[in-house]
Amino acid sequence: MKTRIHLAAPLLALSLATATAAWAQATSKPPEQLGIVSFANSCAPAVQASLQRAVALLHSFWFGESEKTFREVLEGDPACAIATWGIATNIIGNTFSEGPLLARAKQAQEIIERGRAIGAKTERERYFIEAVGEYYDRYGDRTPQQRMKSLSNAFEVVAKRFPDDDETKIFSAVYLTATQSLDDKTFASALKAAAILEIQFKKHPDHPGVAHYLIHSYDYPPIAAKGLNAARRYAEIAPSAPHALHMPSHIFTRVGAWQDSARSNERSAAVAQAAKDPGGGLHASDYMAYAYLQLARDRDARRLVEEAQGIRAAPTAPRGMHYSLAAIPARYAVERGAWQDAAQLKPRESRVLYTIAITHFARALGAARSDDPAAAESDVQELARIAEALKAAKNTYWSTEVEVQRLGAAAWVAYAKGNRDEALKLMRASAELETKSEKSTVSPGRLVPAYELLGDMLMENGKPGEALAAYEQSQVQDPNRYRSLYGAGQAAAQSGNRDKARYYFSRLIDMAGSGDPRHETEAARRYLAGN
């Protein structure tokens, strides 16, 4: 059986370049640029172009289009069992998210059973179908982390069983990265996957999945710079895929390259809009808004807020859509220090509790920092309720993230009430808890880093030296943030450290000096002019 796979591969695993040309000729559409894949299979020659396209789309997380194409393959060749693997894999959605709703998972289980009934023609195809089946086994009884671990373990077996098949290695690597715990500061799983993918990148420099998954493997601040090569290549490899245009900004955001991030997401959002992919467009818009606000491009960020206000996410919409719709307006208020605006934000209805928490966190900060702690207290209580609900649902990561928010919000409420020692104690607890894990890949960054908030509080408490240390600590994790740079410059100036003040204010002007007017930018200019 193994020999048959290797003999079949040159005949049946077409390169995407050939497949795309055939597909474009058949549809009279301009050729897509999705990269080059060569996926061995035993399906009919008539469906090869579509099958290779479906795999390439999957590698670029274009799930709706990929699933549709795999279904067309199965319709064109009812004996093509591997197409059922593709459909079930697309239903998982973003490998780094929490998986589909139960109703969709049941659809995947049904299509897997169909694949088993069809009967895989090769051992490799049977392994692929059974591997994705491991993800859906006892679906409702397991956590997302447990399901992904099962999928990763299954594909590790597949990769070992077929050591000469690079596609198995590539899929195995992305699933391994997806098991990376956000509180593991060694990044062991992600770096192990990256080592596999770096070898594949040399062999397959135009493969969309390799570049894409390398970015995910390095999407953590301490190792993000290692992903710059893949980030710069991926958009060139698959410019027709919205996610390929967006994904480089994960690395650009981690290293604080805001102009690059903004450009990536402008392109991604445009392609997503043309492709009628609202989820991809919103995810790009959240990253875009984050970048704009660091560059003080406030009018551009405001446009994204207005666009988001006109969108309603269905209850069954991907979690990322719910996240972006909550995050964009909250970022716009908080990043600009528009505290009264933040206090007036309205929580959206959502099944995704941690996205509702974003709005309550922004509201609490806004009210407390507008000297209205009484108004903030109900939002702090709501954050506590959400954290407990997530904990009860065994969603430990997001429960902890919301607890970080609750502590930070409670700190500012205490500060507004005049309980400054208690406030600083709570704010330090928030910052220390936040450092124990990384931000989620659904987000360009937390709404505001806890160490940055600690710096703000220390400044208001007349402790600029301690504030400077807090702002600098914040920049270790989140470099080149506007508010951290300004805060560090201000803290350095007030503590008599002229060199550091000039350093941070100069960086702020270089980064955001051509943006929209902000009083912080003008204050930095005045300091530099006089010092």
Where are these regions (language model features)?
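Amphipathic alpha-helical repeat scaffolds of TPR domains
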Residues: 45-53, 81-94, 120-140, 164-182, ...
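Residue at a conserved register position within TPR or TPR-like alpha-solenoid repeats
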Residues: 57, 91, 134, 176, ...
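Inter-helical turn/loop elements of alpha-helical hairpins
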Residues: 63-68, 87-122, 133-146, 179-188, ...
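Solenoid-like repeat scaffolds
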Residues: 75, 161, 201-203, 232-240, ...
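TPR/TPR-like (Sel1-like) alpha-helical repeat modules
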Residues: 81, 88, 92, 103-117, ...
